[in-house]
Amino acid sequence: MTVFARHRDELERHETMMGESGGRLAVALDLLTDALAMVGQHGVYCQNARLPGRPPLDIATVLEQIADAKELLQSVIELDRSRRTP
């Protein structure tokens, strides 16, 4: 099953509101947000032995990369919005 089939309803809803590219970016951003929450939750239960209260380095790196990807996607959405607004 493709990503388009798995997320058909969300894609349809967002593409209707934001256009095809904006809708797809919005759904990608939602998926990254969900992944960020899941990895963050995992980090709560898997603590760093050397730094109590902090997630292990691999989880911290994944969290940082997902947050960076979200920021880039958000910037593309904002650029697209500013180009469409006169």
Which residue stretches match the model-derived regions?
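Long, low-complexity or tandemly repetitive, helically biased scaffold regions used
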Residues: 2-86
